[in-house]
């Protein structure tokens, strides 16, 4: 089969009505769904994600003033960050955030009217996965 791949920092799909939009990500979604008519859409995060680690730090302390565009982009992690149990160790909080970001991104993807319609009509399936960099294992997340 064929693949159409779009990547960005921390593998974020922002909310459909976000003020911090990334038109590249939105255009890629629209192209994949409307033009290519992909039957499967995979939101794939990975362990040891530098973007997630930077985003985690972004919420623990004040954002770095030198990161204008990075700060704006990583602000999209807010919904996932709010769900991180603060009782976990820092390492486990970051691991949780890696997975939660995939879940939230899947929910955000379902806000796109065309995506919602295609899923409802069983013309599109969406999967949330985490790739473990160390082991090579792929974990399917419950969404």
Predicted feature residues:
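Conserved functional hotspot residues or short segments at active or partner-binding sites
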Residues: 43
């Amino acid at each position: 089969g064929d693949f159409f791949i779009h990547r960005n920092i921390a593998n974020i799909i922002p909310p459909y009505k976000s003020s911090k939009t990334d038109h590249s990500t939105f255009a890629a979604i629209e192209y994949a769904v409307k033009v290519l008519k992909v039957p499967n859409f995979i939101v794939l995060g990975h362990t040891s994600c530098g973007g997630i680690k930077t985003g985690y730090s972004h919420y623990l302390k004040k954002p770095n003033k030198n990161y204008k565009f990075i700060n704006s982009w990583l602000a999209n992690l807010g919904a996932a960050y709010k769900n991180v149990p603060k009782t976990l160790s820092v390492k486990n909080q970051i691991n949780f955030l890696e997975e939660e970001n995939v879940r939230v991104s899947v929910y955000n993807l379902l806000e796109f009217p065309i995506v919602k319609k295609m899923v409802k009509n069983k013309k599109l399936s969406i999967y949330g996965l985490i790739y473990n960099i160390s082991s090579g294992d792929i974990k399917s997340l419950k969404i």
